[in-house]
Amino acid sequence: MKPFMDKDFLLSTETAKTLYHDYAAQVPIIDYHCHINPEEIAKDRSFDTITQVWLGGDHYKWRQMRSNGIDEKYITGDASDIEKFEKWAETLQKAIGNPLYHWSHLELQRYFDYYGTLSAKTSEEVFKLCNEKLSQPEMSVRGLIKESNVDTICTTDDPIDSLEWHKAIAKDSTFDVKVLPAWRPDKAMNLEKPDYLDYLAKLESVSGVKIASFAGLMEALKVRLEFFNSMGCKVSDHALSYVMYKPATEEEIEAIFAKRLAGGTISEMEELQFKTAFMVSVGREYNRLGWVMQLHYGTKRDNNVFRFNQLGADTGFDCINTEGSSAELANFLNALNSSDELPKTIIYSLNPTDNAAIGTVLGCFQDSTAVGKIQQGSAWWFNDNKTGMIDQMTSLANLGLLANFVGMLTDSRSFLSYTRHEYFRRILCELIGNWVENGEYPNDIEFLGQMVQDISYYNTKRYFGF
């Protein structure tokens, strides 16, 4: 029997062990998509308890605690930190096969030097140990980032954000990790939302552009795009239920937007037409600026309306959406490509059955402007586990060039989540190691080592231009 999560965790062959320890583990981390708060980096926040770090905003953990019958008081409510931690420990012990079990113990090992197991029996001991560690100066936010060997972080930011904390970090010569903004304009696109006009007023204010038309909206966004670009932004991100393509004329789009400005009701088709025009318009801007466009889709959000009204968005009540088709995705990309304005694009679907469809779409739009110009994103959210990662990378290898893959990101709100890069790298090396030891690929360790370093780090650095 193998020891629990030892140095060769997830590595079953000698090739995998060599590739991980000698190559993948040696390169830094670029976390090009996450949801951490740049203010906490700028102020170098310290945490009082492990509960604050682990359970303060992690809806992955909250979902499992609810599945274990834990009262909301101990999840998002007013229970004490030790009570919440004990309830999480009770839950984690049952999470066999869940990536949270591995992630949590990787974090305990790497940041707290704890190589035991977290359970109901050990929860008090682990709580005290972690809190003692967190009281040390090197366990501040910046210390954790440096300890994790991170060299670049891209946060997630709205077009109206001031980016004041990014400015402060960039001016601080004592911290050499790049913390760059990433453009997330969902609120400017989602005209069906009840607070849409309020948002437009804020966008008008920060851009200095009157938004009385769709053309005006695009001009206001262009002003903000230029500002983000001046702050080092190189990537956009879009959260979509699915990638739609319902084209309309300029006159029709202006009429839809005018109706919404006047407080009118927008039909479902009008919403899709507007969003299509929006995505094509901003896609052209990304190409002009040399940015990467990320498309995250396949999500049905806020399904539990009762809890949404209590707790708000991003609290653990989302699921996979099966709407949409690869045809509309291809048509959207083709609309940009037809005018030679298709930017580098990373495509993520929350629905794992989309893997092969995405893999075939990629091959339709590759060209010589970039290696792997159109990418399939790493297994995301509900697929961010051992099975999901293996399935995504195997599908990508079957249909494209795995060696050109831009690899992993945390998509996290926690400063301890950089161990997810380690998790990914171990799984990557195990996958490739098995192929080699099964005689399916030559045992050229020099080339293989460079490949896993490329997927872990260098492909990303080149692709984004960091």
From Swiss-Prot:
Pathway: Carbohydrate metabolism; pentose and glucuronate interconversion. InterPro entries: Metal_Hydrolase, Uronate_isomerase. One of its GO terms (molecular function) is glucuronate isomerase activity. It is an enzyme of class 5 (isomerase). Keywords: Isomerase. Its EC number is 5.3.1.12. SUPFAM superfamilies: Metallo-dependent hydrolases. PANTHER family: URONATE ISOMERASE. HAMAP family: UxaC. This is Uronate isomerase. The lineage of its organism: Bacteria, Bacillati, Bacillota, Clostridia, Lachnospirales.
